[in-house]
From Swiss-Prot:
Region Disordered, annotated ranges: 1-22
Superkingdom to which the source organism belongs: Archaea
Cellular compartments per GO CC: cytosol
Family to which this protein belongs: Belongs to the PDCD5 family.
Species in which this protein is naturally found: Methanococcus vannielii (strain ATCC 35089 / DSM 1224 / JCM 13029 / OCM 148 / SB)
One Pfam family cited in the UniProt record for this chain: dsDNA_bind
Molecular function per GO: DNA binding
Gene3D superfamilies per UniProt: PDCD5-like
HAMAP family: dsDNA_bind
Protein name: DNA-binding protein Mevan_1162
Residue ranges, compositional bias (Basic and acidic residues): 1-12
Keywords: DNA-binding
Length: 113
């Protein structure tokens, strides 16, 4: 078998697996378990005010909120966060994360003549 045939066969297997209802159910279940575990960790490390602030951010900027959640979990697992995280400390972290994102994004401006 040449590499192209192997790629085609694997692609067909993956497509068949993705259409399998049992596989889809398992994937949804794994996703739900991951979300529940993430929420459990966030409840442990965030104060009530910080959790409500994160919920408001999630409504306004879901992608930014996901990034903040993952960074909070990583910092907590590394033991680099005070537990529970106060709202003031959380605001400082949000500012730092926002500044990091702002500096890495490039803006393109198009000027018309």
């Amino acid at each position: 078998m040449d590499p192209e045939e192997i790629k085609q066969k694997k692609l067909q297997e993956m497509q068949a697996k993705a259409q399998d209802p049992e596989y889809q159910r398992q994937m949804q279940e794994q996703q739900m378990q991951y979300e529940m575990q993430k929420q459990k960790v966030l409840r442990q490390i965030l104060s009530e005010e910080a959790r409500s602030r994160l919920a408001r951010i999630k409504l306004a900027k879901p992608e930014f909120a996901r990034q903040v959640e993952s960074q909070l979990i990583q910092l907590a697992q590394a033991g680099r966060l005070p537990v529970p995280l106060t709202d003031e400390y959380f605001k400082g972290l949000l500012d730092k994360i926002y500044e990091m994102n702002k500096s890495t994004k490039r803006e393109v401006t198009i000027t018309r003549r």
